[in-house]
Each structure stands twice: as C-alpha cells, then as structure tokens.
Amino acid sequence: AGKEGTFMKLPEKKQRWVYHDEVLPQPAGAGVTRRVLAYTDGLMCVENTFEKGAVGALHHHPHTQITYVVSGAFEFTVDGETHTVRAGDTILKEDGVEHGCVCTEAGILLDIFTPMREDFV
C-alpha cells in the first residue's frame, strides 16, 4: 500500500505505483466521478463511476478509447449505434467517432485512451 494519509487529485505523469484510495474522485458531470489512475504522453487509464441515470453526453475527441465495463449496465451509443453493455463487456471507440452513454444500473467504467487526454490533467 501507499503512504497512509496521502491523497491526490491526480497521480504524477509516469507514476509507477498508484493506489486507488489515494486518488480522490473528481466531479465529471451530474452523477459521475472520475479518477485518473495512470498516464504517460501516449496512454491514459481512467476510472469513471456512474450513478443510475447519469449520462455521458454524446461527444468525440481525437483519441482512440477502449472502455471496459467493470460493473453496472449502460446504454452506449457509438457512431449512431446503441447497445446495452454490462460487467465484462468492452467497447472500442476510434478517434473522432461520436459516442456517449446512459447508466441504467449504477456502475464503473475503466477507460484507456491513446494518446493521453490532456484535458483530464
């Protein structure tokens, strides 16, 4: 474990060991919190926690993104196509493709971005 009582909003770039409970969740919209878990210039890992009914608004960005559903259920729309995803499912969103979601059962998404999302730091 990390140093007891040490909390941060964001780990350092290229920080090798990041302990979940030391990264404070940051607001990321109504009913959504975000934890940036690790990143380099070329890669970023982000945990997003959603309350039931929370929305990840449709958007696009110049990053390829892989989303792994850790828990819960979501209606995901990617490039105009909507699917229900649950724990264990994975979604690939190529750069520039519009995507968003609605959380239908409270849950957690793990996002991997390449390159890193500079707007998250």
Q: Predicted segments — roles?
A:
Residues 2-42:
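A short, N-terminal "cap"/entry segment at the start of jelly-roll beta-barrel domains
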Residues 42, 63, 71, 106, ...:
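ATP/adenylate-binding site constellation spanning eukaryotic-like Ser/Thr protein kinases
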Residues 44-60:
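Conserved short histidine dyad/triad with adjacent acidic residue
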Residues 47, 70-71, 86-87, 105:
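A cytosolic small-molecule/anion-sensing beta-strand core signal
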Residues 55-56, 72-77, 90:
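Short beta-strand segments in beta-sandwich/barrel cores
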Residues 63-74, 79:
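Glycine- and acidic-residue-biased ligand/ion/polar-headgroup-sensing regions
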Residues 80-95:
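Short acidic-glycine-tyrosine-enriched beta hairpin
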Residues 95-119:
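Ligand-binding loop in jelly-roll beta-barrel domains
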